[in-house]
Amino acid sequence: MGPGKADLLDAVARSGSIRAAAEELEMSYMRAWTLIRTMNAAFRSPLVEKERGGSSQGGAQLTAQGRKVLELYRRMETKAGRAIAADWERVKKELR
């Protein structure tokens, strides 16, 4: 799990579609679907459920597990950002 996969989960949650999420993130549908399959296989239960196409065009949604993992990941990102903020300011002072 990393920022790209988290962004993909966010985009699926917003759009209700793997294809729309892929377009939003400027990646191919195949790449998005591969990342989702990888995440679904890595966790105890799937993070994304895909609905069949047809007249309703299908779609996708995050499962409860997907929402939980995404929330935990975003919380970790926030904590990490706060933890390094002071050091990052010191690094920026060294830039030209």
Model-inferred region functions:
Residues 8-9:
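Short alpha-helical "packing" element that flanks the helix-turn-helix/winged-helix DNA-binding module
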Residues 26-28:
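Central "turn" residue of the DNA-binding helix-turn-helix
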Residues 35:
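Residues within the DNA-recognition helix of helix-turn-helix
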Residues 41-46:
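Residue cluster at the C-terminal edge of the helix-turn-helix DNA-binding motif
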Residues 50-75:
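Basic, amphipathic "hinge/linker" alpha-helix immediately C-terminal to the N-terminal HTH DNA-binding motif
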Residues 69-91:
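Alpha-helical linker/hinge and terminal dimerization helices associated
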